[in-house]
From Swiss-Prot:
This is Arginine--tRNA ligase. The gene is argS. Keywords: Aminoacyl-tRNA synthetase, ATP-binding, Cytoplasm, Ligase, Nucleotide-binding, Protein biosynthesis. One of its GO terms (molecular function) is arginine-tRNA ligase activity. It comes from Ruminiclostridium cellulolyticum (strain ATCC 35319 / DSM 5812 / JCM 6584 / H10) (Clostridium cellulolyticum). Its main location: cytoplasm.
């Protein structure tokens, strides 16, 4: 796909570097080497279309003031054969580039030709990437942390796919360890209580109290009765877990499906133990001199993971810790399955685990830079201006399913991606269901619906959207028209930056800006009732807006309604 903004950035980059080299040759600048420069879109509209701070970057090496360097670069710059119309200096030494409108008119052509592929780029070159997210505890329902992590992870995966990576979405099923032991103990206690009465056994103080535990055991009893009342406890707990856990996982899958999330792989933690990969990984760490035995347990040396204290890998009862299994799991991702880049989404409370896991990878001979962890902050739900803790429907803690039912999938996914992952998120439930421009998802969807309604009306009058090749694009010269095209031209860059930063919140901000810019255009520039050639040109521009809004919403897995 053609990325005209990328082409322009390269033109600017080449022109600036060539100018610096020429300035060195003429003696206006001392000998220095510049191989790349930062190019950004200025915040101030009057400062051109693109800008670079290269003069400030090389001021020390050039032994001149940034403004003086900028003037020299501008004096020697050659822009023939580029989209650059004007080069100026601003502030302490920013070099600003104003482009001629031909690039905007070419953008209109590109958008209409590429349609749903507009914005897709190829910075990934098919690199094999795994995004592991949600990975909720399978002993209970999906909570708000899972909901936010799900929206973030799914959008990150979609953005990387649009950027040319070969993406796999994975859910780790934590079906081993302490939480499964606690799950089995909770099921066993409830089973005995249902058969013999509540006084027959005390429910574990730290057990799972959810109604699903009771529901599982009632359904189990309906099938098997009291058959297991005298069975050995360990055997009985295994039977109960084998019955209840798949039901919980099925509910998690159902909840995520309703949320628009589809995983390629559901990976069992238990499989790592059964295959011997956990033991194999522990042995590898031992062979590399990374472990120490003490107090009857096996520890990973703190010096290996940059910690003041050692970490237990195998307890004194011979059972590996979750940390050991997690190291084996990450080794499996890289070495067994060949992923070149692994991205995990974890709650911010896991921040201390990031450095340890990266260090563990390094200890295994795996490049830790191939592992990235996106940490996301907590969510607070608000209703009527107060923190909402209970579901309207159930009167219990709000689960993901409750949230989707109350707000709708589109609203939930959009709102969870409005803030950077590292920021706390206040989710206004009342705002998310408002049918007004105050609601950002409604505002964006309305822009798409408004365009579709316009086209339907025009089609009933025999007017169709022409091909961009058939219009006089130069008629689009009003500030509102040019600003809208300029905004549409930024989409491939937004995909690129979102992929590089793993921040899909850029896309919700961007599509809201597109909708806002479109509404400004629509209020300032008539489409129907204008002279024929101008109407045709504006129809193409409106169609390009529809394409971009839909493409962004598709990337966010949010519907683009044709009427509202």
């Amino acid at each position: 796909m053609k990325n005209i903004n990328s082409e322009i950035r390269q033109q600017i980059r080449n022109a600036v570097i060539n100018s610096i080299n020429k300035s060195v040759e003429t003696g206006e600048l001392p000998s220095l080497e510049v191989t790349d420069i930062t190019i950004e879109i200025p915040r101030e509209k009057g400062h051109g279309d693109f800008s670079t701070n290269v003069a400030m970057q090389i001021t020390k090496a050039a032994k001149k003031a940034p403004r003086q360097i900028a003037d020299i670069i501008i004096k020697n710059i050659v822009t023939d054969g580029t989209y650059i119309d004007k080069v100026t200096c601003a502030g302490p030494g920013f070099i600003n580039f104003t482009l001629d409108n031909s690039y905007l008119y070419e953008t209109v052509n590109i958008i209409q030709q590429e349609k749903e592929n507009y914005g897709r780029i190829n910075i990934g070159n098919g690199k094999k990437v795994m995004v592991e997210f949600v990975s909720a505890n399978p002993t209970g329902p999906l909570h708000m942390g899972n909901a936010r992590g799900g929206a973030l992870g799914d959008c990150i995966a979609s953005v990387l796919d649009a950027a040319g990576y070969n993406v796999t979405r994975e859910f780790l099923i934590n079906d081993a360890g302490n939480q499964i032991e606690k799950f089995g103990t909770s099921l066993e206690a409830r089973y005995i209580q249902l058969i013999k009465g509540e006084d027959a056994i005390e429910f574990p103080e730290d057990g799972y109290q959810g109604e699903d535990i009771t529901e599982h055991m009632k359904d189990f009893i309906a099938i098997h009765g009291d058959k297991y009342i005298n069975t050995d406890s360990e055997e009985r707990k295994k039977v109960f877990v084998d019955f209840a856990l798949p039901r919980n996982i099925a509910r998690i899958k159902e909840g995520l499906e309703s949320y628009g999330i589809h995983f390629d792989i559901w990976f069992s933690e238990q499989s790592l133990h059964k295959s011997g990969e956990v033991a194999e990984t522990i042995q590898l760490l031992k062979d590399r001199g990374c472990t120490v035995e003490k107090e009857g347990a096996l520890w990973l040396k703190g010096s290996v993971i940059g910690s003041e204290k050692d970490e237990v890998l195998v307890r004194n009862n011979g059972i590996p810790t979750y940390f050991a299994a997690d190291i084996a799991y990450h080794r499996n991702k890289f070495e067994k399955r060949g992923f070149e880049w692994v991205i995990n989404l974890w709650g911010a409370d896991h921040h201390g685990h990031v450095a340890r896991m990266k260090a563990a990878m390094a200890a295994l001979g795996i490049n830790p830079d191939k592992l990235d962890v996106v940490l996301f902050q907590l969510v607070r739900l608000y209703r009527n201006g107060e923190i909402a803790r209970m579901s309207k429907r159930t009167g219990k803690s709000i689960s993901l399913m409750d949230l989707v039912e109350e707000v709708g999938r589109d609203g939930v996914r959009y709102f969870f991606n409005t803030k950077a992952s590292g920021s706390h998120l206040d989710f206004d439930l009342d705002l998310a269901v408002k049918q007004s421009n105050e609601n950002p998802v409604f505002y964006v969807q309305y822009a798409h619906a408004r365009i579709c309604s316009m086209f339907k009306l025009l089609e009933s009058e025999g007017i169709k959207v022409p091909s961009a090749n058939a219009i006089k694009a130069e008629l689009l010269d009003k500030p509102e028209e040019l600003e809208l095209i300029r905004k549409l031209s930024e989409y491939p860059d937004e995909v690129r930056i979102s992929a590089e930063t793993l921040e899909p919140s850029r896309l919700t901000r961007y599509v809201h800006d597109v909708a806002s810019t479109f509404h400004s255009f629509y209020n300032a520039c008539r489409v129907r009732g204008e002279e024929e050639e101008l109407m045709q040109a504006r129809l193409v521009l409106v169609d390009c807006t529809r394409i971009v809004v839909k493409n962004v919403l598709d990337l966010l897995s949010i519907t683009a309604p044709e009427r509202m």
